[in-house]
Swiss-Prot record:
One of its GO terms (biological process) is leucyl-tRNA aminoacylation. The gene is leuS. Its EC number is 6.1.1.4. It is found in: Cytoplasm. This is Leucine--tRNA ligase. Coiled coil: none annotated. GO terms for molecular function: aminoacyl-tRNA deacylase activity; ATP binding; leucine-tRNA ligase activity. It comes from Xylella fastidiosa (strain M12). NCBIfam families: leuS_bact.
């Protein structure tokens, strides 16, 4: 039904449009279409209970692209689901004394309502939550396949252990080395965990990046660095104990064998077998290893912690010089990386140098410039020359390296590799920084790992006909241990191979497992198998949208899991997504007051009055409730910790969904940070009210007659030219550039131009009708509710605008018959003239000289020359 109100009423308009979309199942799609497919997907949300502005921006970008693509003739899929397992639900369960499942499903209901209020063109019939058994059963089935193929395996690995809560902690739950809830010092504990062999796909993941032409370079660079391919030499160092007995040889991988003569000690990880062996007879070392178990495992902590170590008393024999090198335990060497041992070259490596300086170990130079440019370059200082260890491009040669003196990096590399391989003491290797994916989590709220442990048969995959292994949802959750560990009825079972008593695995999957394949399940949401033939119709995703913070975890696992599904013959494609758009953050001002202890109480911007200078910069702020000053902080990402978030629902209620959508697209290009500014939101609301009034005022003059482009005068042609120029700009902005802010600006320009067009003739009414229809359709991807209503106001029946073709450029309208030229006198603007585009020079000069305001400024002056810039400027030089 058309809206008759002349006042812009967002709630009424949006209710009518959304009811129409729901009742007509407007955004349901299938695979039986002769249109080209287009799969647009924004990363699925975690059901925290409330949308934030980051969600709104992400999903609005996806919705704009989806609606635009449907208007350009595509069969568009835009689904939605919920990444529903995970730690926040457990934390909320502890805080609110409610089962994680109950908390999660309640939040999904609320967030679904919020998403629908924003009018997104989502195919809701494909919705699912990853915590539902009919979703994760397929994940369990895939895991059992991977076990049988040897791509899933179990081994011991270090975790953060809270000795009070008796639970494993994620890195983010370790605060300054202590458990976030108990406050107890966290220990590093080695426990059995399941892994997927992502390293088997390391080279393919690396090579595949070269095919992703439409992924941002920063994402591809981060993935290349995370995969970390390096070519080098694995060297065997013989090891002797304090009694000169031979122990198992130490394997060390290095990309710089040319620095071998600079090795003055060997560092090993605290968990290395040699460290544990030495500690048996060294109480001091045993005590240090116990201390090194304290603290978290995050890379950030390991990088910033104080470097600590101890001499084990063991000696590594230099493979060329036979020098006995001390073997030190060092807390910065990780057992999970490489071989857990490092040949230390403190003369040319910062970390080794800092360690050597602390413990008085030798530092030796083995690299020198061939042709030093100055005294500084020829004088060796370790804190300068350490940088050479990583610099292979400078012109240098080996020194203090026996018969290898004078060789450059490449020459030394090849000679040493050949020598070690010939002697059987080493071999060329390709190494990757990438580690196998640890998928075990010692948590309750996750997908159960489908494995049974039998004393006789060992680890046995759950048979397919016994899947899914269903996670009990109606549990009491305290945070101390996992409910399924203490649920003997759930845990105890029988071995599927021998029939004897057995127990289920009580670990659950890393939640990245669910988010690594959800995009594919949307294509076959009701399939009995993991996927069916519909997957190959929709995949790969044409446009994927999400934050760059997911570059090296989700997006890596996303690509890896797609290759697993390909190798299982579930999908045909090699990569999961063709285009990737990484949207910027939503940021906002922060305000606070300082407490006597120096801590800060963060105040929400909605509770603050601000004063601004003429440039709009905040110069002062007071708390609304007491009128007293508050301090102005930095502009930062919206977050709970800084209390600078804005509730989208409040904004939708206050301004309407289309205003919120319009601002989120107008305030910044998609890839850049968007600074929240309510004054800007109010500006968008004013524009929509003005457009509403503009259309209704036009419609009040009755229906337009047919446009006769052969009967238009100059002014009418100018409006048509502006209209079709706007179509061209917006089409490029939506389609190629993904520059939605400039698309909006172009429509605003057209609206302003039309507002100044006051001709009331029949053909002018028709020209205005075309311009207004164009604006309504161009804005439809961004402001669909308003466009839905205004299309009817312009005399059309209620319809789905996405099924109408996107406006087409009439190239004949772009041919301008006249041009507006600025007229300057001695470089200063004095007037404008309108002339035919093919007007002769004499005609242009005469019009410029006789333009009234220009003529006034020329009185008493002699014209020396006239410079004409075709189509732009006439500059009169006079004295």
């Amino acid at each position: 039904m058309p809206t008759e109100a002349n006042t812009y009423d967002p709630q009424r308009i949006e209710s009518i449009a959304q009811h129409y979309w729901d009742s007509t199942h407007a955004f349901e799609v299938n695979e039986h279409s002769n249109k080209p497919k287009y799969y647009c997907l924004s990363m699925l949300p975690y059901p925290s209970g409330a949308l934030h502005m980051g969600h709104v921006r992400n999903y609005t970008i996806g919705d704009v692209i989806s609606r635009y693509k449907r208007m350009t003739g595509h069969n568009v899929l835009q689904p939605m689901g919920w990444d529903a397992f995970g730690l926040p639900a457990e934390n909320a369960a502890i805080k609110n004394k409610v089962a994680p499942a109950q908390w999660t499903y309640k939040n999904i209901e609320r967030m679904r309502t919020q998403l629908k209020s924003l009018g997104y063109a989502i195919n809701w019939s494909r919705e699912f939550a990853t915590c539902q058994p009919d979703y994760y059963v397929h994940e369990q089935h895939m895991f059992t396949r991977l076990m049988r193929k040897g791509l899933a395996y179990r081994r011991n690995a270090l975790v953060n252990w809270d000795p009070v809560d008796q639970t494993v902690l994620a890195n983010e739950q370790v605060i300054d080395g202590r458990g976030w809830r108990s406050g107890a010092p966290v220990e590093k504990r080695e426990i059995p965990q399941w892994f997927l062999r992502i390293t088997d796909y390391a080279q393919e993941l690396l090579d595949g990046l070269n095919t992703l032409d439409d992924w941002p370079e920063p994402v591809k660079t981060m993935q290349r660095n995370w995969i970390g391919r390096s070519e080098g030499l694995e060297i065997r160092f013989e090891v002797r104990d304090v009694d000169n007995n031979a122990l198992e040889a130490l394997r060390v991988f290095t990309t710089r064998p040319d620095t071998l003569f600079g090795v003055t000690f060997v560092s090993i990880a605290p968990e290395h077998p040699l460290a544990l062996h030495a500690a048996k007879s060294n109480p001091g070392l045993a005590g240090l290893l116990t201390q090194m178990k304290q603290g978290g495992l995050s890379e950030a902590e390991l990088k910033t912690q104080e470097k600590r170590g101890m001499d084990t008393g063991l000696k590594a024999i230099h493979p060329i010089t036979n020098e006995q090198l001390p073997v030190w335990v060092a807390n910065f060497v990780l057992m999970a990386y490489g071989t857990g041992a490092v040949m230390a070259v403190p003369g040319h490596d910062q970390r080794d140098q800092e360690f050597a300086n602390k413990y008085g170990l030798p530092i030796r130079q083995v690299i020198a410039l061939k042709e030093p440019k100055n005294q500084d370059e020829s004088t060796w200082e370790p804190d300068v020359w350490r940088d050479w260890y990583a610099d292979k491009t400078r012109e240098f040669e080996l020194i203090n390296s026996a018969e290898f003196d004078g060789l450059d990096y490449q020459g030394a590399f090849e000679v040493l590799v050949e020598r070690f391989e010939r002697q059987g003491r080493g071999q060329r290797r390709v190494n990757y920084r990438l580690r196998d994916w640890g998928v075990s989590r010692q948590r309750y709220w996750g997908c159960p790992i489908p494995v049974i442990y039998c004393p006789t048969c060992g680890a046995v995959p759950v048979p397919e006909n016994q899947l899914p292994v269903i996670l009990p949802e109606n549990v009491a959750f305290s945070g101390t241990g996992s409910p399924i560990k203490t649920d003997s009825e759930w845990r105890k079972t029988t071995c599927p191979e021998c029939g004897g008593p057995a127990e289920r695995e009580t670990d659950t999957f890393d939640t990245f497992m669910e988010s690594s394949w959800y995009y594919a399940r949307y294509t076959s949401p009701n399939a009995r198998e993991m996927l069916d033939k519909r997957a190959n119709y929709w995949l790969p995703v044409d446009q994927y949208i999400g934050g760059i913070e997911h570059a090296i975890l989700h997006l890596m696992y996303f690509r890896f899991y797609h290759k697993l599904m390909r190798d299982a013959r579930l999908v045909d494609s090699d990569e999961p997504a063709i285009n990737l758009l990484t949207q910027g953050m939503v940021i906002a001002e922060t305000f606070y007051r300082k407490n006597p202890d120096g801590s800060k109480d963060w105040i929400n911007p909605a509770d603050v009055n601000v004063e601004c200078d003429e440039r709009g910069r905040i110069t002062g702020a007071t708390l609304i409730s007491d009128g007293q000053p508050v301090l102005i902080g930095a502009t930062e990402k919206m977050s709970k910790s800084k209390n600078n978030g804005v509730d989208p629902q409040i904004m939708v209620t206050k301004y309407g969904a289309d205003t919120v959508r319009l601002f989120s697209m107008f305030a910044a290009p998609p890839e850049q940070s968007l600074e929240w500014n309510e004054a800007g939101v109010e500006g968008m609301a004013r524009f929509l009210r003005r457009l509403w009034t503009q259309v209704h005022h036009h419609a009040s003059h009755g229906p337009a007659t047919a446009l006769d482009i052969t009967a238009l005068d100059t002014a009418q042609k100018a409006i048509r030219c502006k209209t079709h120029n706007t179509i061209a700009r917006v089409e490029d902005d939506y389609g190629r550039r993904r520059s939605f802010n400039t698309a909006i600006a172009a429509v605003m320009e057209l609206s302003n131009t039309l507002a100044r067009f006051d001709d009331t003739t029949t053909q002018s009414h028709a020209v205005r009708q075309e311009a207004l229809e164009t604006m309504v359709l161009l804005l439809n991807p961004i402001t669909p509710h308003t466009s839905h209503a205004l299309w009817q106001t312009l005399g059309h029946p209620e319809t789905l605008l996405e099924d109408l073709p996107f406006p087409k450029v009439d190239t004949t309208a772009l041919v301008r018959e006249t041009a507006t030229l600025a007229v300057q006198v001695n470089g200063k603007l004095r007037g404008t003239i309108e002339v035919a585009t093919d007007a002769p020079r004499e005609h242009i000069e005469n019009n410029a000289l006789t333009e009234p305001n220009t003529a006034r400024f020329l009185e008493g002056l002699t014209v020396l020359k006239i410079i004409i810039v075709p189509g732009k400027i006439v500059n009169i030089v006079a004295r």
